[in-house]
Amino acid sequence: MKYMIITVVILFTCALKMFCEETEEENHLAIPEDPYPSLPLRNYSCNNMACPLKHICGCMPTPITPETPFRDLDCGCYHEFDMMPVCV
């Protein structure tokens, strides 16, 4: 009887450990939900960006609006003298 109880405890411990490992793995693989799915993707880098003559690549903060109540960065080509975005 004593060995049966020990066996049951060991099996229960192993099963619990396997369940916990699967849960950690599932959490690791879970893709976080995008809190702002309707917002367009922004470019956060000037790498490999070719800007026209007299323009520079830079990152400017976006304005805070009711639709986007947080500060974001928008990287792209800007006029060198006034940092206004280049219209494509």
Swiss-Prot record:
This is U-scoloptoxin(12)-Sa1a. It is found in: Secreted. Expressed by the venom gland. Keywords: Disulfide bond, Secreted, Signal, Toxin. Coiled coil: none annotated. Its main location: secreted. Belongs to the scoloptoxin-12 family. It comes from the Eukaryota. Contains 3 disulfide bonds. Residues 1-20 form the signal peptide. One of its GO terms (molecular function) is toxin activity. One of its GO terms (cellular component) is extracellular region.
